[in-house]
Amino acid sequence: ACAGLYKKCGKGVNTCCENRPCKCDLAMGNCICKKKFVEFFGG
């Protein structure tokens, strides 16, 4: 299983679907899957 867009991801949790980047909010400490760079351009 992989983590969908804006779902929790990280070490020991899930890797992001479609090789999306897992970005962590330093203040909150939670990591979620963000859009790939190309997706912002309708890729």
Swiss-Prot record:
| UniProt keyword Membrane present | no
What CDD domains does this protein's entry cite? Spider_toxin
| Tissues expressing this chain | Expressed by the venom gland.
Which Pfam families does the UniProt entry name for this protein?
Answer: Toxin_9
- Which keywords label this protein? Amidation, Calcium channel impairing toxin, Disulfide bond, Ion channel impairing toxin, Knottin, Neurotoxin, Secreted, Toxin, Voltage-gated calcium channel impairing toxin
Q: What is its main location?
A: secreted
Copy the domain comment: The presence of a 'disulfide through disulfide knot' structurally defines this protein as a knottin.
Q: What is this protein called?
A: Omega-ctenitoxin-Pr1a
- What is the protein's species of origin? Phoneutria reidyi (Brazilian Amazonian armed spider)
